Amino acid sequence: MAKKIAEKFKMMIPAGSANPSPPVGPALGQRGVNIMEFCKAFNEKTKDKMGFKIPVIVTVYVDKSFTFETKQPPASDLILKAAGIKKGTDNPILNKVGSITKAKLDEVIDQKIADLNTNDREAAAKILAGTCRSMGIEIVD
């Protein structure tokens, strides 16, 4: 018989650097989860994605055990890294802060398509192109 789920919640944690301090410690502690066990498991699983904030879905069971599922970093973070810039613009209509090639956008699609709500590469390209547009990043050939 499957374990009974007590609660499911989401967090964004920097890859490889989960520690018991806020916001991780309080979020887990109030649910009765072993904080250090979570931190060690999360850091081990995400050590290859350093520099990104990783979305994680934590499932807590009634016996206070837990499982967690990591997702890919946010599309905006992947795009910023591919474009080689620190942050997007506050006014994407007037200000363009950088550009990204279609080849680099395809690399981002390869990483992110599992987490998007589509399996079609063309639709995924449109989703990520919209993200680029809203950040003030142009797509060039």
Swiss-Prot record:
Q: Which GO terms describe its molecular function?
A: large ribosomal subunit rRNA binding; structural constituent of ribosome
Indicate yes or no for the key word Protein biosynthesis. Answer: no
Entry PTM = One or more lysine residues are methylated.
Q: Which GO terms describe its cellular component?
A: cytosolic large ribosomal subunit
Q: Name one GO biological process term.
A: translation
Identify the Gene3D superfamilies for this entry: Ribosomal protein L11, C-terminal domain, Ribosomal protein L11/L12, N-terminal domain
Q: Does the keyword Ribonucleoprotein apply?
A: yes
SUPFAM superfamilies, per the entry: Ribosomal L11/L12e N-terminal domain, Ribosomal protein L11, C-terminal domain
Q: Which domain of life is it from?
A: Bacteria
UniProt keyword annotations, A-Z: Methylation, Ribonucleoprotein, Ribosomal protein, RNA-binding, rRNA-binding
Member of which family?
Belongs to the universal ribosomal protein uL11 family.
Q: How does it assemble?
A: Part of the ribosomal stalk of the 50S ribosomal subunit. Interacts with L10 and the large rRNA to form the base of the stalk. L10 forms an elongated spine to which L12 dimers bind in a sequential fashion forming a multimeric L10(L12)X complex.
Stated role: Forms part of the ribosomal stalk which helps the ribosome interact with GTP-bound translation factors.
What protein is this chain from? Large ribosomal subunit protein uL11
Q: Which gene encodes it?
A: rplK
